[in-house]
Amino acid sequence: LRSRGLGDVYKRQIQEYLSSLRGKTAAVLGIGVSNTPLIELLCRNGVQVIACDKKSREALGERAPQLEALGAQLHLGEAYLDDLRADVVFRTPGMRPDVPALLEAKARGSIVTSEMEIFFEVCPCTIIGVTGSDGKTTTTSIIAEMLRAAGKTVYLGGNIGHPLLCDAEKMQPEDFAVVELSSFQLLDMKRSPHIAVMTNLAPNHLDVHKDMDEYIAAKENIYLHQHEGDIAIFNEDNDICLLYTSPSPRDRSLS
């Protein structure tokens, strides 16, 4: 569990991060249900938001005028990634970080990140991350319900729930953030959860990943950046999981 003193430090980091974006431009790629709260958060904190989506204005329906009322500028249609210019670009979890539009934005000086990566940096409470080829959602939901049954305050996010960055300011050090993480979200993550759970590994999403090695390398990011005392839990009945999980001085649990 995180200490209250450390929690105050993280809360200041959240406020400082949002303050650092005030007056700057942030492009949010994807105007789905999950990204709308992120757009709202940024707009409320004085960020000039460019909300980008492949959908047309008609397809977005009421969401388009609602976002414009908040101050967001919309960049819609098939060319929504063309000439992407912003101080910060929040990529959607399902988008590879090496697509040409993002590489070009980086070359122009943009910081390309994701809502989840920023959340990991500023979260004041214990993060439990769950990944795997199958069973992620079920396992994530079970962990969250077990903690709630124990009287804990739990924030559910990642592939399920909503953007947790929006909740970070109200989180307490004794709370838990339980996060489902896909291989796409983990692909370029440089931080790992305090408790990492890998349900299993099997060939999956190879239409998007270059090969099985890249897919597994993405999954391994759930624990590769952990610190001493953090915990990683693996499924010992899954041969691929055991084969590819590298040894480490950090705590390891097989179940």
What positions do the PLM features span?
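Single conserved hydrophobic/aromatic residue that forms the stacking wall/gate
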Residues: L1-Y10, Y244-S255
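Conserved Rossmann-like nucleotide-binding pocket used by diverse enzymes
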Residues: R2, A27, V197
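Short, conserved glycine- and acidic-residue-centered signature motifs
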Residues: R2, N35, C123
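N-terminal leader/targeting and accessory segments in enzymes
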Residues: K11-S114, I118
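Secondary-structure boundary/capping motif
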Residues: K24-T25, Q66-L70, K152-T153, L243-S246, ...
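Phosphate-binding loop of NTP-binding sites
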Residues: D82-A86, P93-E236, I240-L243
